């Protein structure tokens, strides 16, 4: 083995070539209206009730597991808690995929961490693009299952906001029976709880459901997520999870959020978000620069603009930070807008209202050239 003076040459080749996930915080910005990460716009206050910081926490804090199990309508042995749902995504790859041999499958446009997690572990990323209506292409999935061990499906899907047809989810579970785990990412399910598939766990041993406290529970900064699955899968994941995934303060606050009072507050937030989403969707349709607003079952809206780069930068310059989706398959000229407070939604509309529509596309194209250098550091694509 030849020696190198560059320590980075010692890293795995796939890591050296890896493009990391561009989170909203990594992209940065100096705005005061943050509508790019699907967070709840207002903070929630908690007081720590546990002070035993000199002791290591439980691997799976009992009070958190029991409260989430009760909330989800499942026995505790079917629940695992982790550092956000993102860790749950990784745990499935670590437990089920042989690096350099197995693959995961997902259907873009969708959440970007499935791809990044697989690449990090040296696992093939196999994509089956969604159909024009963003539903699953079942024949194509059936033709691409060779060596696939985990299939990720996000419903409601991020960034499109649509629910996946439940009959199609059942078809994928049947196709994957005995071959692959099917992980349904329900990060946004609190905004449409009737669409959850958690009651399917008794019928599908290969079903896994990913959940989080980051969205409707307004705890994105806490980093607390859940994996729901049959107990055999939970036991496998416990073999590969870190020994202390949740710190004592995180477990304390998570348990409070999952109390009856905390759940009621969450549902009030969901009601507020839905009302603001309806208002924003209606108002966007009256903006000349907006070509289409897509129906959403989540806490964000996807919209197609006449010239999204100009729109993105115009709002950025006014301190309103959105999420650019142009590089996702089928999402040319699309921006994703998190549902903020009513005041924040009104600021978005006030900023969009004077922007020209399709009849002034030449002017917009000229603006795009002006913005081309700055936009490359401003945009997130996932």
Curated annotation (Swiss-Prot):
Residue positions, PTM N6-(pyridoxal phosphate)lysine: 215
Family: Belongs to the class-II pyridoxal-phosphate-dependent aminotransferase family. Histidinol-phosphate aminotransferase subfamily.
Keyword annotations: Amino-acid biosynthesis, Aminotransferase, Histidine biosynthesis, Pyridoxal phosphate, Transferase
Catalytic activity field: L-histidinol phosphate + 2-oxoglutarate = 3-(imidazol-4-yl)-2-oxopropyl phosphate + L-glutamate
Region (Disordered): 363-382
Gene3D superfamilies hit by this protein: Aspartate Aminotransferase, domain 1, Type I PLP-dependent aspartate aminotransferase-like (Major domain)
Name of this chain's protein: Histidinol-phosphate aminotransferase
EC number(s) stated in the UniProt entry for this protein: 2.6.1.9
GO biological process: L-histidine biosynthetic process
Any Pfam family: Aminotran_1_2
Pathway(s) it belongs to: Amino-acid biosynthesis; L-histidine biosynthesis; L-histidine from 5-phospho-alpha-D-ribose 1-diphosphate: step 7/9
GO molecular function term, any single one: pyridoxal phosphate binding
Assembly and interaction partners: Homodimer.
InterPro entries (UniProt xref): Aminotrans_II_pyridoxalP_BS, Aminotransferase_I/II_large, HisP_aminotrans, PyrdxlP-dep_Trfase, PyrdxlP-dep_Trfase_major, PyrdxlP-dep_Trfase_small
Source species taxonomy: Bacteria, Pseudomonadati, Pseudomonadota, Gammaproteobacteria, Enterobacterales
Root EC class: transferase
Protein biosynthesis keyword on record: no
């Amino acid at each position: 083995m030849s020696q190198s003076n560059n320590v980075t040459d010692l890293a795995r080749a796939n890591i050296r070539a890896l493009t990391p996930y561009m989170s909203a915080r990594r992209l940065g910005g100096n705005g005061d209206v943050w509508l790019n990460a699907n967070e709840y716009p207002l903070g929630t206050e908690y007081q720590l009730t546990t002070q035993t910081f000199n002791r290591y926490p439980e691997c799976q804090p009992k009070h958190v597991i029991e409260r989430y199990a009760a909330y989800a309508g499942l026995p505790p042995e079917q629940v695992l808690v982790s550092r956000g749902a993102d860790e749950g995504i990784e745990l499935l790859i670590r437990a089920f995929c042989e690096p350099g041999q197995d693959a995961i499958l997902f259907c873009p446009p969708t959440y970007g961490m499935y791809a990044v997690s697989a690449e990090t572990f040296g696992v093939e990323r196999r994509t089956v693009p969604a159909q024009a209506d963003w539903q699953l292409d079942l024949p194509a999935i059936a033709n691409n299952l060779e060596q696939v061990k985990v299939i990720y499906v996000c419903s409601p899907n991020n960034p499109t906001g649509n629910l996946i047809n439940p009959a199609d989810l059942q078809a994928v579970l049947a196709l994957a029976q005995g071959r692959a785990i099917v992980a349904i990412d329900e990060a946004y399910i609190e905004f449409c709880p009737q669409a959850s598939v958690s009651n399917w766990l008794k019928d599908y041993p290969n079903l896994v459901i990913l959940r989080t406290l980051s969205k409707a529970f307004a705890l994105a900064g806490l980093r607390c997520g859940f994996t729901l699955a049959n107990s055999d899968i939970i036991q496998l994941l416990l073999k590969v999870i870190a020994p202390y995934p949740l710190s004592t303060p995180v477990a304390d606050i998570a348990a409070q959020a999952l109390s009856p009072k905390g759940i009621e507050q969450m549902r009030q937030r969901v009601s507020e978000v839905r009302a603001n989403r309806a208002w924003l969707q209606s108002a966007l349709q009256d903006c000349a620069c907006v070509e289409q607003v897509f129906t959403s079952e989540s806490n964000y809206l996807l919209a197609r603009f006449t010239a999204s780069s100009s729109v993105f930068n115009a709002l950025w310059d006014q301190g309103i930070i959105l999420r650019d989706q142009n590089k996702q398959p089928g999402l040319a000229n699309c921006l994703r807008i998190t549902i903020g407070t009513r005041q924040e939604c009104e600021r978005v509309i006030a900023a969009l209202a004077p922007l020209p529509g399709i009849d002034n596309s030449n002017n917009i194209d000229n603006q795009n050239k002006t913005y081309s250098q700055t936009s490359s550091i401003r945009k997130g694509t996932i």
